[in-house]
């Protein structure tokens, strides 16, 4: 890990962020809207023909061995049932730049990762995906509604999700599902409001940020914003 991080930092220092960004822009050749459409079409393929969503890993591995130009960045939950490469139609290595943690939280590590995707890799789309029956969001709702406490690092981990749970706690319907959707929206907004690098790229029309919701039942990815 130390060598990998050191190499990444050295590479960025040697070429400069601006230079890397210009090179990455030409590498992807994909606009934000085109990237979103590619994800939508891939998800439709996953829903209709899941058996066909298998990547040719050997060929893809050779294609990206010397570099990457992912055309979308995805922040999703660490839940084992949510596999973005499959959900979007059997994508292979090098297609999407993926961040995963419990509750799809845009914390400092994720923000830095997404910024790297924008600056160094030229990724034109950032999608934040919440999913049905998310355990992290359900736990945050338990903290808000039932005053439940969780051991170890789980309690602090849930703090960024609490505002979403609080926002929907008094609403009718499935509070957990409402909170999952609200959290995805808020985390997407947090990416924009907390990163001047990404905000600048969005304002320039080079990057789009969207929130989405993944159904475990039918495999559909619903765009929320």
Predicted features and spans:
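N-terminal short beta-loop-beta anion/metal-coordinating cradle
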Residues: 53-93
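C-terminal segment of N-terminal export signals and the immediately downstream linker at the start
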Residues: 15-48, 52-56
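GST superfamily/GST-like fold recognition
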Residues: 203-223
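Charged, glycine-interspersed solvent-exposed loop segments at helix/strand-loop junctions
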Residues: 170-210
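N-terminal export signals
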Residues: 1-21
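Short HxH-centered metal-ligating active-site micro-motif
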Residues: 32, 83-174, 180, 186, ...
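Short coil/turn connectors at secondary-structure junctions
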Residues: 68-71, 93-96, 121-125, 204-205, ...
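Divalent metal-coordination and catalytic microenvironments
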Residues: 39, 74, 99, 128, ...
């Amino acid at each position: 890990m130390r060598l990998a991080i050191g190499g990444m930092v050295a590479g960025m220092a040697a070429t400069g962020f601006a230079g890397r960004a210009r090179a990455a822009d030409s590498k992807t050749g994909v606009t934000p809207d085109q990237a979103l459409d590619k994800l939508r079409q891939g998800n439709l393929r996953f829903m209709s023909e899941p058996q066909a969503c298998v990547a040719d890993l050997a060929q893809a591995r050779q294609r990206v061995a010397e570099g990457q130009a992912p055309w979308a960045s995805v922040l999703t939950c660490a839940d084992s049932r949510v596999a973005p490469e499959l959900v979007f139609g059997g994508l292979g290595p090098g297609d999407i730049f993926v961040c995963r943690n419990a509750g799809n939280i845009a914390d400092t590590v994720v923000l830095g990762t997404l910024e790297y995707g924008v600056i160094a890799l030229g990724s034109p789309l950032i999608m934040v995906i919440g999913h049905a029956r998310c355990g992290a969001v359900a736990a945050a709702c338990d903290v808000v509604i039932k005053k439940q406490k969780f051991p170890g690092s789980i309690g602090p981990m849930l703090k960024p999700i609490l505002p979403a749970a609080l926002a929907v706690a008094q609403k009718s319907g499935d509070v957990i599902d409402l909170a999952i959707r609200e959290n995805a929206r808020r985390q997407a907004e947090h990416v924009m409001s907390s990163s001047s690098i990404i905000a600048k790229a969005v304002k320039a029309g080079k990057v789009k940020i969207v929130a989405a919701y993944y159904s475990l039942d039918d495999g559909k990815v619903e765009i929320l914003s």
